[in-house]
Amino acid sequence: MIALCGSWCHNTRAMTPSLTKYAKENGIDTIYTYDFNLDDNENGNTFIRMSDGSENAGVNYNYMYGEVVKQYLTNIDDWIEFPSTTERAISYTNAKGETETVGRIQQPIAFIYNKDNTTNYSDKEDNADKYPVMYAFEQMVERDKDGLYTKEYDEEGNEVTDKNGDPVKHYCTKKYNAQMKKMFDFINDNNIEFTEYSKEDFVRENYPALKDAEKVNIKTVTYRQFAWLLQQDGNAIYMVGGPYDEATQNEIADVNAKAVKNDVNVYLWDPYVDGKISEDDWGYKNTGDIMKSDSINFMYTTLIENSLTNLTTEEFENGADGASLTYKNDAGEEKTVPVIKSPFVFSFNKDATDEDGISAPITAYSEKADTLDAVFSAYADGITK
């Protein structure tokens, strides 16, 4: 089971308790989630489910949404409110420069997926060879202390309010839960069995050097998880890189071995918002690297401003070409920061200071395999302090 949703979204927060309840009642302990909002920010600026012509930063990556729908969710039109034939469908430009149109999936949506399913379980007539989306539940509601509800809107899309100026609410808890329960009844009636995949499975498959490792202490994290971890107390070790990068592939076994030996997890963050799949597999020219993309490099500089305040690299110190990024902060000041070259491994403690008492959260870093020991030593020193 997969849910397209985000913790920033009030509709997601409304759905989650009900979805979790029915999943537990039916013995489903894992629901895989994905968010089309690149930085999970509530302002929606990096939301990629946008049609060409939109003004937010995410529209530059709307092909990521389009390709996922076109290549994998091929029958999603049968299950959503705004399929590709409606005015609210999503248009994007493919790798060949052609305009494509796909259905507009609302967040949140929960669905049962099997890429090899050949049975059409929807009530729509279709002659496809496969129907990977076996069942989907897409209903937009909100939640308060009294339950689930929808708001009332006028013909122009404005909220209808009562005499006190509060939005008019129509509570629908029982109806909503009954509709969601149908998905779980479908699971039981059709004896659907779920296959579980873990982050470790992903790491082993995408990093061949770790395929047969006795233990894997490399834990992949999303952008939001990375930003959150950097704000937590205590010591940690992080690695920046991705499976597309040969240098990361060459070093990751050594990093994992040292992590296992030191009984510590290393959190691996990929600076590509698409894992470089758009370039390597789909033929797009636009880069998904947040350090190189003008439209979303603020995601990278935000990490530096908020957490990685003493970040530096050898190439940055030597003034090498391409080793820095210049931008203007919220105050309009021009800043220049280092660009990380994968793989980059560092030990971190948000409260660490240097010998002069100045904040220095990155306590050690490594850009080469032969300097990894310094990172693990700094981590160990931080633990014993």
Predicted ranges, named:
Residues 100-194, 335-385:
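Non-catalytic, surface beta->alpha helical segment in thiol-disulfide oxidoreductase systems
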